[in-house]
């Protein structure tokens, strides 16, 4: 991940081999091909995103502030490592990234719904939908930078929260 962050999203296996001082044949002892190596990078990035957003969500108090904290942690991660984020997006075969992050959002939303005594059946659909929304907005923000990260967090939270809160009066009161 460090090599991609330092050298950019267009990095190839030769670049990774040189930068990490590991001969290319050694990579192929562990990975069958370049795609498998890139998939592992995507998984590592997704696991980092999950860890960072989990820490931020756990530190927040109310459900709404947890939503904002999760969005902010996601945006902070891509802001600090834009080339790594672009690398993951550039390689469309890295579906695991979206799945790992989407399942994490599903778990968080499902927990909120169950705590409020609500049916959590919509959690997966909402989790993946919210991840897609935030990811699309993040892509645009990363390219345009027409507003601060805090403003993006506020706008996205304002857009998403009424849908989540409307599902439960207990959440809405938080």
Task: Report each predicted region and the residues it spans.
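Helix-turn-helix
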Residues: 6-36, 40
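Short, hydrophobic secondary-structure boundary micro-motifs
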Residues: 12, 86-89, 150, 171-173
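Alpha-helical DNA-contacting segments of helix-turn-helix folds
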Residues: 3-4, 31, 38-49, 88, ...
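Short glycine/proline-centered loop/turn elements that form peptide/ligand docking sites
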Residues: 7-12, 34, 112-123, 166, ...
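Short linear capping/connector segments at secondary-structure termini
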Residues: 54-55, 87-94
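Short, structured helix-loop boundary elements
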Residues: 13, 35, 39, 64, ...
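Amphipathic alpha-helical packing segments from all-alpha helical-bundle domains
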Residues: 93-117, 122-139, 151-154, 158-162
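Hydrophobic alpha-helical connector segments
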Residues: 40, 54-83, 130, 153
């Amino acid at each position: 991940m460090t090599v991609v962050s330092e050298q950019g999203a267009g990095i190839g296996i030769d670049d990774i081999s040189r930068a990490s001082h590991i001969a290319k044949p050694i990579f192929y002892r562990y990975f069958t091909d370049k795609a498998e190596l890139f998939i592992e990078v995507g998984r590592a990035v997704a696991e980092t995103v999950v860890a960072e957003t989990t820490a931020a969500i756990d530190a927040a108090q109310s459900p709404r502030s947890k939503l904002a904290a999760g969005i902010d942690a996601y945006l902070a991660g891509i802001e600090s490592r834009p080339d790594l984020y672009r690398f993951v997006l550039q390689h469309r075969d890295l579906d695991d990234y979206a799945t790992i992050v989407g399942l994490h959002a599903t778990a968080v939303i499902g927990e909120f719904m169950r705590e409020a005594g609500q049916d959590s059946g919509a959690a997966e659909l909402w989790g993946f939908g919210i991840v897609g929304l935030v990811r699309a907005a993040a892509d645009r923000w990363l390219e345009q930078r027409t507003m601060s990260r805090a403003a993006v967090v506020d706008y996205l939270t304002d857009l998403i929260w009424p849908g989540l809160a409307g599902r439960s009066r207990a959440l809405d009161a938080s």
